[in-house]
Swiss-Prot record:
Root EC class: hydrolase
CC cofactor note: Binds 2 magnesium ions per subunit.
Record-listed E.C. numbers: 3.1.3.11
Family annotation (PANTHER family): FRUCTOSE-1,6-BISPHOSPHATASE-RELATED, SEDOHEPTULOSE-1,7-BISPHOSPHATASE, CHLOROPLASTIC
Provenance organism: Albidiferax ferrireducens (strain ATCC BAA-621 / DSM 15236 / T118)
Name of the gene encoding the protein in the UniProt record: fbp2
Protein known as: Fructose-1,6-bisphosphatase class 1 2
Organism lineage string: Bacteria, Pseudomonadati, Pseudomonadota, Betaproteobacteria, Burkholderiales
C-alpha cells in the first residue's frame, strides 16, 4: 500500500465518512487493540517471561488453564474496565459476567472475548490469538447476564488478533473486513489489507481427522468425498490443514480460502458442539460472512442462533460459501 494508515486513522475515517463507528465504539476498539499489543509482547517473551505452562486451575468449561490464559484475561479486563465505553464484559475464562465497577463510568457496550484461543499450542510456539465481539447493552438500569444473550447478527464489531510470525489484527464493524499488522518499531497497527474476500470455492479443508469415527453421517460423507479427490464425486483433489487454533485456521481461510469444520460428535452427545457460540463462533462467523463466506451449524446460520446461556456451545462450519452450503445440504438430506 502506498500510504501507511494506522488503526486509529482507519477508525477515525470510518467514523467521519461512513458513519459505521460511533465515537465510543471507536475508542473501545482502540483499547482492545492496545490490550492485544500487550498480550502479544507477553506471548513473545515465552519461557523468558515465565509465562509458559499450566496454571493448575480449570475454567468454567472444565478445561485446564494455561498461565497465559489467565494473564490475557486480566490484561483485557484491566485495559477496558476504566475507559467509560463498557457496561460489562464476559470471557470464556470466567464463570459469569464482569460488571464495570462503580468507581468507573459505565458505557453502552458489552465486550465478549476468548482471551487466548488455541492455548494448547502455547508451549510449542504455534500461532494463537485473541477473539472479541461487541454488542450494545439493551436499555434498562444495571447489567444482567441476560443482556449478553443476543444473536450474533446484533454484533456491532468483531475481530481477532493472531500472534504468529507477525501480530495481525482482523476487524469488522459491518462494512467488510480489514487487516492490520503490528509495526513493532512504531508500536502501531498498520492497515495491510482492506475488503478481504473468501473465495466461494476451495480445495482445502480444516478439520481434526482423529475425531472422524465420532462424527455424524453428513460430516463423514462430506470429508469422505473430499478425500476421494479427482476420482470421487467432487472431481478435484483437496488438501487438509489443521493447526488446532481456531484463530490460525480461520485466518488462513480468510486470506486464501478454505472451509473450517468443528462438528458435533458422539463423545458428548448432549452438547451441540465444542466451540463457544458467544466468544468464538459468533465473531468468526460475522467476519467470514463480511468477507463473502458463510457460517453454519449444519442446520442453521450461526448468526441467527438465539443464545440460551453465556457459555453455550455450537457446531461450526465456516469458510468458502459453496462448501458450507454443501455441508448444510448434506445435513438436510440426512
Amino acid at each position: 500500500m502506498n500510504k501507511r494508515i494506522s488503526l486509529t486513522r482507519y477508525l477515525v475515517e470510518q467514523q467521519r465518512m461512513e458513519g459505521h463507528i460511533p465515537a465510543q465504539l471507536r475508542l473501545l476498539l482502540e483499547v482492545v487493540a492496545r490490550a492485544c499489543k500487550r498480550i502479544s509482547l507477553t506471548v513473545n517473551k515465552g519461557a523468558l517471561g515465565g509465562v509458559l505452562g499450566s496454571a493448575e486451575t480449570e475454567n468454567i468449561q472444565g478445561e485446564m488453564q494455561k498461565k497465559l490464559d489467565i494473564i490475557a484475561n486480566e490484561v483485557l479486563i484491566e485495559a477496558n474496565e476504566w475507559g467509560g465505553h463498557l457496561a460489562a464484559m464476559a470471557s470464556e475464562e470466567m464463570d459469569g459476567i464482569y460488571i464495570v465497577p462503580n468507581r468507573y463510568p459505565q458505557g453502552e457496550y458489552l465486550l465478549m472475548f476468548d482471551p487466548l484461543d488455541g492455548s494448547s499450542n502455547i508451549d510449542v510456539n504455534v500461532s494463537i490469538g485473541t477473539i472479541f465481539s461487541v454488542l450494545v447493552k439493551p436499555d434498562g438500569q444495571g447489567v444482567l447476564e441476560q443482556d449478553f444473550l443476543q444473536p450474533g447478527n446484533q454484533q456491532v464489531a468483531a475481530g481477532y488478533c493472531v500472534f504468529g510470525p507477525q501480530t495481525t489484527l482482523v476487524l469488522t464493524v459491518g462494512d467488510g473486513v480489514a487487516m492490520f499488522t503490528l509495526d513493532r518499531e512504531q508500536g502501531s497497527f498498520i492497515l495491510t489489507a482492506e475488503n478481504m474476500r473468501v473465495p466461494v470455492d476451495t480445495q482445502e479443508f480444516a478439520v481434526n481427522m482423529s475425531n472422524q469415527r465420532h462424527w455424524d453421517t453428513p460430516v463423514k460423507r462430506y470429508i469422505d468425498e473430499c478425500l476421494q479427490g479427482k476420482d470421487g464425486p467432487r472431481g478435484k483433489d483437496f488438501n487438509m490443514r489443521w493447526v488446532g487454533s481456531m484463530v490460525a485456521d480461520v485466518h488462513r481461510i480468510l486470506t486464501r480460502g478454505g472451509v473450517f469444520l468443528y462438528p458435533w460428535d458422539k463423545r458428548e452427545p448432549e452438547k451441540p458442539g465444542k466451540l463457544r457460540l458467544m466468544y468464538e463462533a459468533n465473531p468468526m462467523a460475522w467476519l467470514i460472512e463480511q468477507a463473502g463466506g458463510a457460517a453454519s451449524t449444519g442446520k442453521q446460520r450461526i448468526l441467527d442462533l438465539q443464545p440460551g446461556k453465556l457459555h453455550e456451545r455450537v457446531s461450526v462450519f465456516l469458510g468458502s460459501k459453496n462448501e458450507v452450503e454443501r455441508i448444510a445440504r448434506y445435513h438436510g438430506e440426512a
